[in-house]
Amino acid sequence: MKAVVIGAGEVGYHIAKFLSLTHDVIVIENDEDALRRADELDVQVVEGNGANADILASVLPDVDILVAVTGVDEVNIVACMTAKLILRAHPGWKETKTIARVSNPDYIDVPVTSRAQVGVDIMICPELALASEVAEVLSNPSAIDAEMFAGGKVQMMEFAIRPDNRLVGKRMQDIELEDCCIVSAIFRNNDIIIPHGDDFIKANDHMVVVGKPRAMADLENVFGNEGPHRNRILLIGCGIVGFYLAKIIDKDENADLKVIEYRKSRCIEVAEMLENALILNGDGTDVNLLREENIEDMDVVIAVTDNDEKNLLCSLLAKQMGAKKVIARADRSDYVPLFEMVGIDIAVSPREATVNEVLKLTMGKGIEALATIEGEKAEIIEYTASGQSKIVGKPLSKIKFPKGAIVTMVVHDDDVIIPRGEFIIREGDRVIIFALSSAVRSVEKLFK
């Protein structure tokens, strides 16, 4: 398959990086620094304006997907519109799916939508995608990440093992998991471990668990984290991300939501649109204000202003003053590990949320769902096994799997199975695989 990515900034670079694992990718960019960085990838680089008709016409033949993710909404929309006009003038060319990154709430009010009538098959809003991701994390109090697969039959959750967790120092075989759950991977510092029974659990490990949703709901007890129950939530910053997230939380009858916003006019505007939340005009770094609002009693503090440094400071203050769990927005991808290194429970990125959404929409043949983990170091991928797949019809022990990839779950009809070496995958089975990013291309070949 062939893909065009317009814009090689934070978002475009990472989309091109991942698409290049399964697609032939062309990157269009006019910034010299971004061009040099994109040139490090296994992609073709074209210098120029991605909305230019001549440039688009030169790359469009045989393109399956065009993704416009520059930092300017109008450029992204015009690029998609122009591509569709060019395709109409060349009916023999392959039909191209167009995807545009759009942030302005005047254009989009949901994370993902379609504007096919103007030439944009899919619009994605990074800020709203991020808000949805945070809301998903809030619905699973002890988890730092969560995704559904196989139409809701399989769930992935990632847990951070705190130093005081009762599992620290124990072996994997000592974890009492139900038969329908499996620990797929452990992230430890910069290492990724495919665990075995005699592996020890260490403080600050991140553990990826896959299983049936019913069993996953009980994992809070297994992992021993004192998970908050979404009751008392303080949201700092009510821009696009904050407001969309506030709307989601505001509908939860069990949530007691307070919002801190420094712009008085925005406070008045938001107060008229939220029914249950308490809106406070102030600065999220004001220690006196935080103390007045009893931050030590907060179950969750979420800092989602448009400024990474302010989010970091707000989060550190909240943590120091006793908040149970802190979530912070980090627009710069290199800040995410830094935030977590200094004690922020969860760092979330609009860029990563957007990459996840684009990858879901550009998945290759046979791929039903996909989620990136730990800053895109690994992926959980759901495939449907076709009759031609190399993985079908023989025991798993006889299949040469690439290093860094394992089959975690198989859904056969309505049965969810943790496969062993003698298990045989059949045509039509849904196969959930954990794979390091370096192993994804090799895994793809097994399903062709």
Curated annotation (Swiss-Prot):
GO cellular component: plasma membrane
One Gene Ontology molecular-function label: potassium ion transmembrane transporter activity
Binding site for NAD(+) 2: 232-262
Cited InterPro entries: K_uptake_TrkA (IPR006036), NAD(P)-bd_dom_sf (IPR036291), RCK_C (IPR006037), RCK_C_sf (IPR036721), RCK_N (IPR003148), Trk_Ktr_HKT_K-transport (IPR050721)
Limits of the RCK C-terminal domain: 144-225, 368-448
Record PROSITE patterns: RCK_C, RCK_N
UniProtKB keywords: Ion transport, NAD, Potassium, Potassium transport, Repeat, Transport
Domain topic, free-text comment: The RCK N-terminal domain binds NAD and possibly other effectors. This is expected to cause a conformation change that regulates potassium transport.
Functional description taken from the UniProt entry: Part of a potassium transport system.
UniProt name for this protein: Trk system potassium uptake protein TrkA homolog 2
Origin species: Methanosarcina mazei (strain ATCC BAA-159 / DSM 3647 / Goe1 / Go1 / JCM 11833 / OCM 88)
Recorded name of the encoding gene: trkA2
